[in-house]
Curated annotation (Swiss-Prot):
Annotated GO MF terms: electron transporter, transferring electrons within cytochrome b6/f complex of photosystem II activity; electron transporter, transferring electrons within the cyclic electron transport pathway of photosynthesis activity; oxidoreductase activity
Originating gene: petD
SUPFAM superfamilies per the UniProt record, alphabetical: a domain/subunit of cytochrome bc1 complex (Ubiquinol-cytochrome c reductase) (SSF81648)
Organism the protein comes from: Gloeothece citriformis (strain PCC 7424) (Cyanothece sp. (strain PCC 7424))
Listed name of the protein: Cytochrome b6-f complex subunit 4
CDD domains: cytochrome_b_C (cd00290)
Principal subcellular localisation of the protein: membrane
InterPro entries referenced in this protein's UniProt entry, alphabetically: Cyt_b/b6_C, Cyt_b/b6_C_sf, Cyt_b6/f_cplx_suIV, Cytochrome_b_C_euk/bac
Membrane-crossing segments per the record: 36-56, 95-115, 131-151
NCBIfam families membership: cytb6_f_IV
Length: 160
């Protein structure tokens, strides 16, 4: 059984359709320039107009309105800076905190040299890199979660 069916050009009905410009070689208007120059920009501008219209008609409030006369108890950075903030907060010396943050990329640059004898790309066959990645991910999550707690509960995450 064939997957493709070839047209029977000896069929008079098919030959009549092909003579009129109908059939497998006629699909309507060409994509260039009609669709690409006229229809697509209209769709894109319509989408942008819809998004802007929804943003103007129903603006989403982000958090509570700012009160310039009330200072918050603790000012926190954006969520993606929580681990860095926690390192600076828990280390007693600020220079030590900056040195620890500079040591992280330097340590990551050493991993390929430590594991240079292993040429595999599969992470399960590269135990040193996988171990560093897993420990680094867990420590980063732990530091990020601890940044939202008060300083006395930040290292234990309020569990102990």
């Amino acid at each position: 059984m064939a997957v493709l069916k070839k047209p029977d050009l000896s069929d008079p009905k098919l030959r009549a359709k092909l003579a009129k410009g109908m059939g497998h070689n006629y699909y309507g208007e060409p994509a260039w320039p009609n669709d690409l120059l006229y229809v697509f920009p209209v769709v894109i501008m319509g989408t942008i107009g819809l998004v802007v219209g929804l943003a103007v008609l129903d603006p989403g409030m982000i958090g509570e309105p700012a009160d310039p006369f009330a200072t918050p108890l603790e000012i926190l950075p954006e969520w993606y800076l929580y681990p860095v903030f926690q390192i600076l907060r828990i280390l007693p010396n600020k220079l030590l905190g900056i040195a620890c943050q500079a040591a992280i990329p330097l340590g990551l640059m050493l991993i390929p040299f430590i594991e240079s004898v292993n040429k595999f790309q599969n992470p399960f066959r590269r135990p040193v890199a996988t171990t560093f990645f897993m420990i680094g991910t867990l420590v980063t999550l732990w530091l990020g979660a601890g940044a939202i707690f008060p300083i006395d509960k930040s290292l234990t995450l309020g569990l102990f």
